[in-house]
A protein has these predicted regions:
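A conserved regulatory-domain signal marking ACT and ACT-like small-molecule sensing domains
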Residues: 2-102
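Metallocofactor- and cofactor-centric catalytic cores in central/energy metabolism, strongly enriched
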Residues: 60-63, 75, 79, 89-239
Length: 240
């Protein structure tokens, strides 16, 4: 790993946003208890972003705190210290970044509802057959009769992911999902991660050419140099 990559990796590891916590605390409903909790949080040099009251009874107040800490170890120490304090119970603690990634950050959704048999006959068989034949007779019709015109394949082999280096296709998926989210959020373009379990240049080129009919564009993402340049140039020449 180069000095630049090592510096970038440390930047990601040390970022306070990477250790933003959601803490659900059950606090005794007594005067001064909220102040005691915030004082404990302050001792750990943590910032409180928000405090939301979830429930109130005569005995306790249930509050959700959104907090940033310096690192993961400090977050664990803070949670442990709060739980030891009389009148405070940590009901749940979660890393907000990980919470956002549970079950993935993107999904495929239908643009047309399928509520009954008639709808099904239009979007699938038998009606879809006529659409297939229209594209068979005129391949350019695929851009107006399918999702292709608005779809991008985000292709990686996981060899040069951000400042993390060669971490493999599975570990690259969260970044590729994030890239797909940017396409959707800022341009309303549907993008999907294609994470390849190969580092072979010829195999990557072959795979991308094989999947190209299903996408309007191909984004080569986080493939290590110098292979990335050869792959890009070859695909520019060999794809339309």
């Amino acid at each position: 790993m180069t000095n630049k990559e090592d510096s970038t990796q440390k930047q990601y590891q040390d970022s306070p946003i990477g250790y933003e916590l959601a803490l659900l605390l059950k606090i005794a409903n007594e005067p001064g208890m909220l102040g005691k909790v915030t004082t404990i949080i302050g001792k750990f040099k943590s910032n409180i972003y928000t405090v939301d009251t979830v429930d109130v009874t005569h005995e306790y107040t249930l509050r959700e705190f959104r907090i940033s800490t310096s690192d993961q170890e400090e977050a664990h120490k803070l949670s442990t210290e709060l739980d030891k304090h009389d009148g405070v119970e940590v009901v749940h603690a979660s890393d907000i970044t990980f919470q956002m990634h549970r079950q993935g950050k993107i999904e495929i959704s239908n643009k047309v509802p399928v509520n009954n048999h008639a709808d099904l006959s239009h979007v699938y068989t038998p009606g879809v057959g006529r659409v297939c034949m229209a594209i068979h007779e005129n391949k350019d019709a695929v851009y107006s009769l399918t999702h292709k015109a608005n779809t991008i394949a985000v292709v990686t082999d996981g060899t040069a992911v951000l400042g993390l280096g060669d971490i493999g296709p599975e570990a690259a998926m969260p970044v590729m999902e994030g890239k797909a989210m940017l396409f959707k959020s800022f341009a309303n373009i549907d993008a999907w991660p294609i994470c390849l379990d190969t580092k072979d240049t010829e195999e990557i080129i072959s795979i991308v050419k094989a999947i190209a009919p299903g996408f309007g564009g191909i984004l080569l993402e986080d493939i290590s140099a110098p292979r990335c340049f050869e792959i890009e140039e070859r695909l520019k020449k060999e794809l339309d």
